[in-house]
Curated annotation (Swiss-Prot):
This is Membrane protein insertase YidC. It comes from Marinobacter nauticus (strain ATCC 700491 / DSM 11845 / VT8) (Marinobacter aquaeolei). NCBIfam families: PRK01318.1-3, yidC_nterm, yidC_oxa1_cterm. Keywords: Cell inner membrane, Cell membrane, Chaperone, Membrane, Protein transport, Transmembrane, Transmembrane helix, Transport. GO terms for molecular function: membrane insertase activity. Residues 70-80 have a biased composition (Polar residues). The chain crosses the membrane at residues 3-23, 354-374, 378-398, 445-465, 485-505, 522-542. It is a multi-pass membrane protein. Belongs to the OXA1/ALB3/YidC family. Type 1 subfamily. Residues 40-52 have a biased composition (Low complexity).
Length: 567
């Protein structure tokens, strides 16, 4: 019996340890409380900083750095100083996006995700990219280098022209293309093209260079993510645990390398990569750049004042007079949806970080998603998943409950042994083991199902915590977000009550101290579960109800079989 309780308590300790400590060590990054200094305006901040992206050595042997002006700069000889701000930004609307593109530089400075609310009680769409006086998060791209309009030593940015100030994906259309045009003083026509598709968070960015001048044109394509150091606005802490906030670089040699704000502040990345990607991650969402397949790129990080800049630069593209060329890359600005990310680039789906038990979490997620497709409710899908898991462990649980039922049946004999050999623990232990052997009882049998199901429990926690599909997912009545704690603590209380009923079916430990501890377990678990996601508490509650039914049936059966047996 002592061994059984030790294993049980050890198992419970493992649950606490793995669910809190592992997340804190591997995934939780302390979120800085210091937001980047407020800018008096996006225009004024743009003129005060330089963003230095080092060109690849093969076309910049001298190591010269070309300043790339940040989005928002109005310093351009081509710009109209009286241009209204309303005319400066181009609005692009699809079924999933509302984007704002700055004509100065042609960069995406704002993105609203139309299918995701800012918060549970808000009807405003979630903003991922933004450029305000207090927040900066941008998707930039440009042409730098010798002749690149974004790489002039004067720090000027090209001012693009567009056919209209508003583009919208029309009904019946599946694709939308936005062409921004700029002509250099030497006569080189540059078209910056954005291509978007229906039901897609993929943004294809390309430059078409038409060299109408008399000299060869040379420039380097670059893509960047620019972000301040503000905390994650979409983070939904659970048990004080927050999702990873920071940068990730993927290369064939190192498919998933993290750089948090501290790393980005202390060291500068500068490495040549082919077939890789870089991204900035926050809870449920990410922004990523994926260079073209088999295209060599120089991945870099740097600072722009208080802002972090992470990006890449292609080797130089040379366009002879009278010739044309096209160069570009793919961006992703949106939710962490495994299937979409998996199709976009190798290892990009790993940004949905299910932890070291991913080999359990991933199948659980796909099964849960399949159930949701059948019933259309994530809460009901969790219940069906619980039934399935219970069915998988049915025989193991039955063996455990039979062992506990037999322990309950021989409880009077155990009490008698304690009375006879209470002062001789060694003799008492020998007699107890002899009794277990005679009655074919496994003293560890009652703990085994709990230990075996722990990985499932922990994996489901990560599924609920990381899956954007469960963000703001309602169940019924007062449960409107399964990824967050029950606001009224009703589910944890019901779970505690079910655990109390289940404990009453177990044999009473002969040790009074153990008996008191076991009586307190439902209360301890209830308090522990108060801050768990409602979906996880729902899983545990349904599992308890199914376990009670199975255990009650087996206990009654064993008691009937041993009713006339004397010890």
């Amino acid at each position: 019996m002592d061994i059984q309780r030790i294993v049980l308590f050890a198992g419970l300790a493992i649950v606490s340890y793995l669910m809190v400590l592992a997340w804190n060590e591997d995934y939780h990054q302390p979120q800085t409380e210091q937001v980047a200094e407020a800018q008096s305006s996006s225009d004024s901040s743009a003129t005060n900083s330089t963003d230095d992206m080092i060109l690849p050595e093969d076309n910049n042997a001298g190591g010269e750095e070309f300043a790339t002006p940040e989005t928002g700069s109005l310093a351009s000889t081509s710009a109209n100083s009286d241009q209204d701000l309303a005319d400066r930004f181009i609005t692009v609307t699809t079924d999933v996006y509302e984007l704002k593109i700055d004509r100065v530089g042609g960069n995406v400075v704002d993105s609203s995700l139309l299918q995701y609310d800012e918060s549970l009680d808000s009807e405003q769409p979630l903003k991922l990219l933004t450029n305000t006086s207090t927040r900066t998060y941008l998707l930039e791209s440009g042409l730098i280098g010798r002749d690149g309009p974004d790489g002039s030593q004067a720090g000027e940015a090209p001012v693009f022209q567009a056919e209209t100030g508003s583009y919208q994906l029309a009904e019946g259309e599946d694709e939308l293309t936005i062409n921004l045009v700029y002509t250099t003083d030497s006569g080189v026509a540059i078209t910056k093209r954005y291509h978007l598709a229906r039901n897609s968070y993929q943004i294809d960015v390309s430059y078409l260079i038409d060299n109408r001048s008399e000299s060869p044109w040379q420039g380097n394509f670059t893509g960047k993510i620019v972000r301040d150091q503000a905390p994650d606005p979409t983070s939904q802490a659970s048990m004080g645990i927050r999702a990873y906030l920071g940068m990730v670089i993927s290369t064939p040699e190192d498919p998933y390398e993290k750089y948090d704000f501290e790393d980005l502040s202390e060291k500068r990345v500068n490495q040549s990569v082919t077939n890789g990607w870089l991204a900035f991650l926050q809870h449920y969402f990410l922004t990523a750049w994926i260079p073209e397949r088999d295209q060599k790129a120089q991945f870099q990080t740097t600072r722009r004042g208080d802002l972090h800049v992470m990006g890449f630069v292609y080797p130089a593209t040379t366009v002879a007079p009278g010739e044309t060329a096209e160069v570009g890359a793919t961006a992703y600005v949106g939710p962490k949806i495994i299937d979409r990310l998996e199709a976009l680039a190798p290892n990009l789906d790993r940004t949905v970080d299910f932890g070291w038990l991913f080999f359990i979490s991933l199948p659980l997620f796909y099964i849960l998603e399949w159930f949701y497709g059948l019933v259309g409710n994530w809460g009901v899908a969790i219940i069906l998943l619980t039934v399935l898991v219970k069915a998988v462990f049915f025989h193991l649980s039955a063996t455990s409950y039979r062992s506990m039922a037999k322990m309950r049946a021989v409880a009077p004999q155990l009490t008698r042994l304690k009375e006879l050999y209470g002062d001789d623990r060694q003799r008492m232990s020998q007699e107890m083991m002899a009794l277990y052997k005679r009655e074919k009882i496994n003293p560890l049998g009652g703990c085994l199902p709990i230990l075996v199901q722990m990985p499932v429990f922990i994996s489901l926690y990560w599924v609920l915590f990381e899956s954007v599909q469960l963000r703001h997912a309602p169940f019924m009545l007062w449960i409107q977000d399964l990824s967050q704690m029950d606001p009224y603590f009703i589910l944890p209380i019901l779970m505690g009550a079910s655990m109390f009923i289940q404990m009453s079916l177990n044999p009473t430990p002969p040790d009074p101290m153990q008996a008191k501890i076991m009586k307190l377990m439902p209360l301890i678990f209830t308090v522990f579960f108060l801050w768990f996601p409602a979906g996880l508490v729902l899983y545990w509650l349904v599992n308890n109800i199914l376990s009670i039914s199975q255990q009650w049936y087996i206990t009654r059966k064993i008691e009937a079989e041993t009713a006339g047996k004397k010890y």
